[in-house]
Amino acid sequence: MSGWPRIYYKLLNLPLSILVKSKSIPADPAPELGLDTSRPIMYVLPYNSKADLLTLRAQCLAHDLPDPLEPLEIDGTLLPRYVFIHGGPRVFTYYTPKEESIKLFHDYLDLHRSNPNLDVQMVPVSVMFGRAPGREKGEVNPPLRMLNGVQKFFAVLWLGRDSFVRFSPSVSLRRMADEHGTDKTIAQKLARVARMHFARQRLAAVGPRLPARQDLFNKLLASRAIAKAVEDEARSKKISHEKAQQNAIALMEEIAANFSYEMIRLTDRILGFTWNRLYQGINVHNAERVRQLAHDGHELVYVPCHRSHMDYLLLSYVLYHQGLVPPHIAAGINLNFWPAGPIFRRLGAFFIRRTFKGNKLYSTVFREYLGELFSRGYSVEYFVEGGRSRTGRLLDPKTGTLSMTIQAMLRGGTRPITLIPIYIGYEHVMEVGTYAKELRGATKEKESLPQMLRGLSKLRNLGQGYVNFGEPMPLMTYLNQHVPDWRESIDPIEAVRPAWLTPTVNNIAADLMVRINNAGAANAMNLCCTALLASRQRSLTREQLTEQLNCYLDLMRNVPYSTDSTVPSASASELIDHALQMNKFEVEKDTIGDIIILPREQAVLMTYYRNNIAHMLVLPSLMAAIVTQHRHISRDVLMEHVNVLYPMLKAELFLRWDRDELPDVIDALANEMQRQGLITLQDDELHINPAHSRTLQLLAAGARETLQRYAITFWLLSANPSINRGTLEKESRTVAQRLSVLHGINAPEFFDKAVFSSLVLTLRDEGYISDSGDAEPAETMKVYQLLAELITSDVRLTIESATQGEG
């Protein structure tokens, strides 16, 4: 490009460089989208806009992509490197109005006909200044936002710092030419498909128009289900119909979000400023699969694990910066206090009570509101655990909202609903001290403004944050596979509860928890905490800690827990340096070197971070424990031992493998442990390697407390086969608390009620106990003896003496 156009662009770029601060989606387009910069690249934009073109240019230059203003030379032919699908008023003939775009597509395709080695990558790019969906006023949402010059000027002026450049995966023009030909009709089809692509992309980024709140309430009141619930309310409480209707409206006011794009923008600015000061980085993985689902028209339901109140803000912030619509979020009614409640409501929160029992009107209003969100196409987010995990492990899922999601599908008319499991990880959780107190029996403090201010005042260096998107679960596909005749239950009026609903919801919930754990993120803090807590003195020399971290890292890299899990690329030494900056550990120096210590008062809190990745290391830890105890053991016997204990571990930690997959996993882990020199393999037997016995012992310690807990329950069951489930849970906790005191076990979840409740349910499912409570003493004693070999003799004596003392 030369002459007047170049001067014009330079002049136009002066104000744009000041007013526009755009963000690229994805953050690093070339590697994330697989663009090959050694091959020709041309850009396709939805409509003629110089501001968009220059904003794209700035991002291309920042990411080492070809300059869109520099023409492509192919076989002596000069062609513009960009194409506008929709035309507009032109200043120079250099611009390409709509009919020109078809000609340009044809020219590019024609060059592929004459040059068999040519393969131009066509990259669709949309530039968005602001993402306000607007309010419903009857007009149809335009497929592309065409702004004239004056409108564009004000959009840039007001929204220049809220602009996004969205790069889409490239389309190979070579493949297009080979499969569809190169004539003009193919060029026209290409332009038409591009227009549809941009319309879908805009909907995925901006979302459907927002309803006026009163219009939404009126529509809900007119629904058959709520009208019937209002009549029932009036009859059962002996109040007038008007009063019952007012009660319904009051519930809608309590529940419904009041989404505000301006509040999203303001919060984005504040959070952007805050994150940069609190977090050293927010790591996002597998977002492209979610963008693709949104682009394909799926109704997205985000199902993250729940670690902290920070989850609400972090996930919405991440989604917004990934070019997706911030979802409507189901938040606990405990967060509806001033000023947080009104702010969260404008950020998309809708509030949910802890229980629906005994309030038919409330449950009907909530279910209809959720169904309305789905039918309008809004993305939704809820925490399937029901509350924040106090231990760092996933909680057993609460299935109420998930059940309502499937009931919404049974009303018919919704787009395909896809559940997106999300793992959220932190190197520092601000509530972790409060969690430890609550697990020790302290009363949960009610959320309030003073409590919020105290929490904010404690915010310091939070390290790294992690948001990993797990494997999506399309509900329609799942139901087609597991409940082939589910469509027979569709009822557009009534909320139906077919017989298959509860077991199916339970299975989906369990599957979601597994998928969340599959997307686990190892980081400096949880790895260092795992190693230091494995040491009985909670201290290791720097060399020992480095060796232990290398063991964990190699296991996770060479035998990955799943394809969705992430492991740091940094070295063990770099991870230790980073963890030390978090000020959780003490360092003592002597003439030999550094000793890294986890102070006693911190040890209880640090179990939280260890538990975040317990599922990723528990199988190699169990293998290490078995090999350490037996000194040498055949693969077959090792496999038998793992097979006996695996169902309990799978249920407790939501592990991903089925029993029939275990032999291959055990073999892969054994080979990796041999490669690391932790064990030797001789004649199909695993032997300890004395040179690395400490590393193996520390690895084995990762399963120590879990095995002790199982030993308690199996001993109680063997000693009293007729014990009922409730008493078994209670007595197991009592012995665990005693063990914790006598043997200095610092993990609060060691005697957590939920952990023992889950274990006893698994024992029932595995046939160790029946619903009537009777156990098979021979079987339970066999398992106890297996466990007794894996725990120390002093712990075993404490367990056995506890029950003898009671007798």
UniProtKB/Swiss-Prot annotation:
One of its GO terms (cellular component) is plasma membrane. Changing residue 352 to A: Reduced acyltransferase activity. This is Glycerol-3-phosphate acyltransferase. It comes from Escherichia coli (strain K12). Keywords: Acyltransferase, Cell inner membrane, Cell membrane, Lipid biosynthesis, Lipid metabolism, Membrane, Phospholipid biosynthesis, Phospholipid metabolism, Transferase. One of its GO terms (biological process) is CDP-diacylglycerol biosynthetic process. It catalyses: sn-glycerol 3-phosphate + an acyl-CoA = a 1-acyl-sn-glycero-3-phosphate + CoA; sn-glycerol 3-phosphate + hexadecanoyl-CoA = 1-hexadecanoyl-sn-glycero-3-phosphate + CoA. The keyword Lipid biosynthesis applies. Changing residue 421 to S: Reduced acyltransferase activity. The keyword Protein biosynthesis does not apply. Pfam families: Acyltransferase, GPAT_C. It is found in: Cell inner membrane. Belongs to the GPAT/DAPAT family. It is an enzyme of class 2 (transferase). One of its GO terms (molecular function) is glycerol-3-phosphate O-acyltransferase activity.
